[in-house]
Amino acid sequence: MPAAIQITECPRDAMQGLHQFIPTELKAAYINLLLQVGFDTIDFGSFVSAKAIPQMQDTADVLQKLDLSNSKSKLLAIVANYRGAEAAAQHPEITYLGFPFSISETFQQRNANSGIDKAFETVKNIYALCDQKNKKLRIYLSMGFGNPYGDEWSVDILLKWADQLVELGVEDMYIADTIGIATPGQITQIMNQLKGYKNIRFGMHLHSTPDTCLEKIEAAYSGSCRLFDTALKGYGGCPMAKDELTGNIATENLIGYLQLQNESLTLNYDKLREAMDFSVRIFG
């Protein structure tokens, strides 16, 4: 497990569920502010079907408006199939391709119109493409803590797919609490199991209500997780969650917790406040 804290800020996840289209210039202005904060990575957009996620149809245009000249942050784009991966891989500015791989058969079918086995074949092809194009592949193990469909779930099932991905060569995986149902006990249990993997970067993409945010952060951190996905003010998250208050882990809550643990964070807090103020123009 990495020793240093690495935060991936996720404006893509925050924005993608909004029904009203956010102008390209406004998206780019917000992300440009985030690029100055000092996050390790920015999950800035996705190369997916415009029909599936209309909000992200301008990702390539947004990318052209980003100023990376004075930013240490890397860019990540989400892809859902090989075609999207090809489109993303054409852009030298992008470091990571992120692929959501569901360990729930039902969710995988609904999300990508293919079963888990077929999705794994897609991962193989995207991994080869990343190797060819000098990109890094990040796998999100969706429904990593259970699912609402009655599909079988266990830590063993999660680890089975993690093992297969490691055998393929994947070195970067985030466990995704897609519908916000993870308990602190589950998080601790899974983190303890993941400690057995050597030279693999495991992170957490957690969703929560405001009331459960800190306990989930604490469980992950106490279990040696140092890689976190977050979004300012907890925007975005879980359209399928039963509780409409369920969203992404709020970046400012994670930062506050880490400061209490005396973690050294090399962030520009003035730019962070500026980005938080600006976010109202997008999210209201």
What are these regions (language model features)?
Residues 1-284:
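Catalytic cores and adjacent flexible loops of soluble metabolic enzymes
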